[in-house]
Amino acid sequence: MIQMQTNLDVADNSGARRVMCIKVLGGSKRKYASVGDIIVVSVKDAIPRGRVKKGDVMKAVVVRTAKDIRRADGSVIRFDSNAAVLVDNKKEPIGTRIFGPVPRELRGRNHMKIISLAPEVL
């Protein structure tokens, strides 16, 4: 459950380390984002010589949340931290590698490129 002002880790090698959600896309009154949703983020911490720098405003896909994700079979999955992957306007990842596991729910949201780059799909 991601809302405005939420800080997230970046799960790719785009150069950003931490980002902050500044808008949840998908309707004027939408308050929360979950796994697979697209948000607008501001880069708060970045590594030197990365593709992005501190202060950049980007779009990102939420890939992990500390809030439970309930599945159709009744099982629940949750992660230790909130994480996102930076994407361009065509919803393609900016980085070339994804770090950490990603949930299967991204497949239903048409983020196949992120799933193919991820080392583990839960």
From Swiss-Prot:
PROSITE patterns, sorted: RIBOSOMAL_L14 (PS00049)
GO cellular component: cytosolic large ribosomal subunit
Similarity comment: Belongs to the universal ribosomal protein uL14 family.
Recorded GO MF terms: large ribosomal subunit rRNA binding; structural constituent of ribosome
Protein name as annotated: Large ribosomal subunit protein uL14
GO biological process, one term: translation
UniProt KW rRNA-binding keyword: yes
InterPro entries for the chain: Ribosomal_uL14, Ribosomal_uL14_bac-type, Ribosomal_uL14_CS, Ribosomal_uL14_sf
Gene it is expressed from: rplN
PANTHER family to which the protein is assigned, alphabetical: 50S/60S RIBOSOMAL PROTEIN L14/L23 (PTHR11761), LARGE RIBOSOMAL SUBUNIT PROTEIN UL14M (PTHR11761:SF3)
Subunit structure: Part of the 50S ribosomal subunit. Forms a cluster with proteins L3 and L19. In the 70S ribosome, L14 and L19 interact and together make contacts with the 16S rRNA in bridges B5 and B8.
Record key words, sorted: Ribonucleoprotein, Ribosomal protein, RNA-binding, rRNA-binding
Protein origin, superkingdom: Bacteria
Source lineage: Bacteria, Pseudomonadati, Pseudomonadota, Alphaproteobacteria, Hyphomicrobiales
Task of the protein: Binds to 23S rRNA. Forms part of two intersubunit bridges in the 70S ribosome.
Organism this protein belongs to: Bartonella tribocorum (strain CIP 105476 / IBS 506)
A UniProt-annotated Pfam family: Ribosomal_L14
